[in-house]
Amino acid sequence: MVRDGYFYGLALLVVAVIVHLLTGGWSWAVLPLLLAAFFLWFFRDPKRAIPGGEGLVVSPADGKVTEVARIRTPQGELQRISIFLSVFDVHVNRSPVAGTIASVAYQKGLYLNAMDPASAKKNEQNTVVVRADAGYEITFKQIAGLLARRIVFTKRVGDRVERGQRVGLIKFGSRTDILMPPGFEILVRQGQRVSGGSTILARAAEGAGVLAAAPTAPGTLASTERPI
């Protein structure tokens, strides 16, 4: 379980006990007890089987694939997979590839519904570029939603990460985008459910030249993405 779950859960359990002592019964303590149970469940962090193999990109989050598209950016043409996380999904984020954190760019913004296409540009977000061991770069974005008001990223530039390793959290419903060069074969489709760290999203195609189209300026992606 994520540490936040213990904090919220224990705090509400204390509230429930205080209410019980003040009222002499448990009827008024039911609500904080239910909320405590919800937070303990919401911040769950199940173990995942991380797939092995070369050139694989795994999902950085649990949720539903809402878009698979090609977009134009100042860095060239990229492929984007968007994943919507409802309040019922696990909200732990995981690294899509093994490598080194090349850059982290935080952008203040709005809190539009994560299903709104405009949320990719206007919402609060954190853009992370991971330079894979094979040399290419994969970008993923933690995007806040209508209820998600806090983005957590636990790594720093230069840190080593493994494929499927826990790297952050988005609280209470959100969206995660992953951007990759054209030289990757997409293995998921719109509407498919994915699991963070275990579902394979894409595979690098041999001889596809994935290095040339790798994004290098994550701070500009949010405002300049254009669908093809």
From Swiss-Prot:
One GO term of the biological process aspect: phosphatidylethanolamine biosynthetic process
Reactions this protein catalyses: a 1,2-diacyl-sn-glycero-3-phospho-L-serine + H(+) = a 1,2-diacyl-sn-glycero-3-phosphoethanolamine + CO2
A GO cellular-component term linked to this record: plasma membrane
One function term, GO molecular function aspect: phosphatidylserine decarboxylase activity
Pathway, per record: Phospholipid metabolism; phosphatidylethanolamine biosynthesis; phosphatidylethanolamine from CDP-diacylglycerol: step 2/2
Modification after translation: Is synthesized initially as an inactive proenzyme. Formation of the active enzyme involves a self-maturation process in which the active site pyruvoyl group is generated from an internal serine residue via an autocatalytic post-translational modification. Two non-identical subunits are generated from the proenzyme in this reaction, and the pyruvate is formed at the N-terminus of the alpha chain, which is derived from the carboxyl end of the proenzyme.
Organism: Acidobacterium capsulatum (strain ATCC 51196 / DSM 11244 / BCRC 80197 / JCM 7670 / NBRC 15755 / NCIMB 13165 / 161)
EC supergroup of this enzyme: lyase
Keyword Membrane part of the UniProt annotation: yes
Cofactor: pyruvate
Quaternary state and interactors: Heterodimer of a large membrane-associated beta subunit and a small pyruvoyl-containing alpha subunit.
PANTHER family found in the cross-reference section: ARCHAETIDYLSERINE DECARBOXYLASE PROENZYME-RELATED
Cofactor annotation remark: Binds 1 pyruvoyl group covalently per subunit.
UniProt lineage: Bacteria, Pseudomonadati, Acidobacteriota, Terriglobia, Terriglobales
Keywords: Cell membrane, Decarboxylase, Lipid biosynthesis, Lipid metabolism, Lyase, Membrane, Phospholipid biosynthesis, Phospholipid metabolism, Pyruvate, Zymogen
Transmembrane intervals: none
Lineage: superkingdom: Bacteria
Membrane topology: Peripheral membrane protein
Active site: S174 (schiff-base intermediate with substrate)
Protein name (record): Phosphatidylserine decarboxylase proenzyme
